[in-house]
Swiss-Prot record:
Keywords, in A-Z order: Ribonucleoprotein, Ribosomal protein
Origin: domain of life: Bacteria
Pfam families: Ribosomal_L34
Gene Ontology, cellular component aspect: ribonucleoprotein complex; ribosome
Keyword presence, Chloroplast: no
PROSITE patterns linked to this entry: RIBOSOMAL_L34
Protein name: Large ribosomal subunit protein bL34
GO BP, one annotated term: translation
Family per similarity comment: Belongs to the bacterial ribosomal protein bL34 family.
An example Gene Ontology molecular-function term: structural constituent of ribosome
Length: 44
């Protein structure tokens, strides 16, 4: 059985990156929650 986590910087950024978050309404909601919480890093 293979390991499920096969790291890829591009895939990571495209699915969880800042621009990916900004692209949808729910993604923007995620960012605003993280800002409200005071996260140092909003997105990958």
């Amino acid at each position: 059985m293979k390991r499920t986590f096969q790291p890829s910087t591009i895939k990571r950024a495209r699915t969880h990156g800042f621009r990916a978050r900004m692209a949808t309404k729910n993604g923007r909601a995620v960012l605003s929650r993280r800002r409200a919480k005071g996260r140092k890093r909003l997105a990958v």
